[in-house]
Amino acid sequence: MNFPIFALFSFVSGSIPFGYWIALRFAGVDIRKLGSKNIGATNVGRLIGWKFGFIVLALDITKGMLPVYLSSVYVPEGGIPFQLLCGVCAVLGHMFSPFLGFRGGKGVATTFGVFLVLTPIACLGAVLVFWVVYKFFKFVSLGSIFASITLPLVYAFSTILLLHEEVSYWVLGTMVFISFGIILTHRENIIRILNRSELFAVKGEEQDGDSERNRR
């Protein structure tokens, strides 16, 4: 399989809107018109149940992992640069899905899948950042933004200090590029956070969050 065909496969793989299809199939709802109007796992879990939310999360992560892994197996001559290109194609497919009129999701889970194959330690660090931010603020979107911002930093420090290896500027540059894209896809979330109208991941947390804000 040549480079263009595999890159196209990566884009199509990433563009499969699992969240939209699962919500439509099992709950009969258009996820793009409810809640945060996002097709990702958080909105699916919030609206139709976290059993489905976690399924969507796993599938969206797999959309990022599969093209990167398969490109290393079937197009090994492409090396890390081509694996990264396939990863970027998968993330762009998720963000601009042709199945949804070239609209899509935020790209966080798919990005996690891409770098879980290439830099698992950095991904674990980013997950830790996400969890800390989420536990404190109760916003998945804010945790995702901070995780995407810190991912390149965690990669650089973990590579140098833990693995004692040289930083790949291909990997680092791609991380920065995708992280910037993720921040752009969260621009509406950022506005809602500033306006204090952002939705919590779990409905029951809304009252607790409002009470906490009133005490500040």
UniProtKB/Swiss-Prot annotation:
Enzymatic class: transferase
Enzyme Commission code(s) on record: 2.3.1.275
Membrane topology of this protein: Multi-pass membrane protein
Protein's pathway: Lipid metabolism; phospholipid metabolism
Catalysed conversion reaction: an acyl phosphate + sn-glycerol 3-phosphate = a 1-acyl-sn-glycero-3-phosphate + phosphate
Disulfide bridge partners, by residue number: none
TM segment ranges: 3-23, 48-68, 82-102, 112-132, 142-162, 166-186
Domain of life: Bacteria
Database matches in InterPro entries: G3P_acylTferase_PlsY
Gene Ontology molecular function, alphabetical: acyl-phosphate glycerol-3-phosphate acyltransferase activity
Keyword Transferase in annotation: yes
One GO location term (cellular component): plasma membrane
Keywords from the UniProt entry: Cell inner membrane, Cell membrane, Lipid biosynthesis, Lipid metabolism, Membrane, Phospholipid biosynthesis, Phospholipid metabolism, Transferase, Transmembrane, Transmembrane helix
One Pfam short name: G3P_acyltransf
Gene Ontology biological process terms, A to Z: phospholipid biosynthetic process
Subcellular localization: Cell inner membrane
Chief place where the protein resides: membrane
Family that this chain belongs to: Belongs to the PlsY family.
Function: Catalyzes the transfer of an acyl group from acyl-phosphate (acyl-PO(4)) to glycerol-3-phosphate (G3P) to form lysophosphatidic acid (LPA). This enzyme utilizes acyl-phosphate as fatty acyl donor, but not acyl-CoA or acyl-ACP.
Entry-linked PANTHER family: GLYCEROL-3-PHOSPHATE ACYLTRANSFERASE-RELATED, INNER MEMBRANE PROTEIN YGIH
Assembly notes: Probably interacts with PlsX.
Name of the protein in its database record: Glycerol-3-phosphate acyltransferase
